[in-house]
Regions:
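A short glycine-rich, His/Asp/Glu-containing loop-to-beta-strand
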Residues: 1-28, 34
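Extracellular structured ligand-interaction cores
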Residues: 11, 71, 84
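Short, charged/polar surface micro-motifs in flexible loops or helix N-caps
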Residues: 20-24, 44, 53, 68-70, ...
């Protein structure tokens, strides 16, 4: 549920999610333009970060800064559903890196996907521009 949009939010987004047992909220990733926070509303999700995995409890709040230090993933390793509220800044345009696979997603200012690729050889600046 996109809570932020429903209440007219423009600069801060909020999404409430339920995660069933054995599932993950998203792949392990990091944002380069937007900061995110998680608030645990129900259950005991496992949080994966660059420091490893640890279990969160109801009421816990964690901030994920921009860049690789803020990489994160929410995992439900329990036998009942969990509920979390994700908050984020809403800077238009975004670069998201999926660290397990090396994929990178670039989003435009209208939230459209511009590029979704794995890094490879870097093209020369003028390559193909003739």
């Amino acid at each position: 549920m996109l809570v932020g949009q429903r209440i007219g939010g423009e600069l801060i987004g909020a999404t409430m999610s339920e995660v069933e047992p054995g599932n993950r909220l998203w792949p392990y990733h990091t944002h380069y333009l937007n900061e995110e926070w998680v608030i645990v509303l129900r259950g005991e999700p496992t949080l994966r970060t660059p420091e490893g995995e640890h279990v969160l409890n109801e009421g816990d709040v964690v901030c994920f800064p921009r860049g690789k230090a803020g990489a994160h993933q929410i995992i439900n390793g329990t036998d009942s559903s969990i509920r979390v509220l994700m908050l984020s800044s809403m800077i238009r345009g975004e670069i998201i890196e999926y660290l397990d696979t090396g994929k990178v997603l670039a989003k435009g200012v209208e939230d459209e996907d511009i590029m979704f690729a794995r890094p490879g050889p870097t093209p020369e600046y003028w390559e193909g521009e003739d």
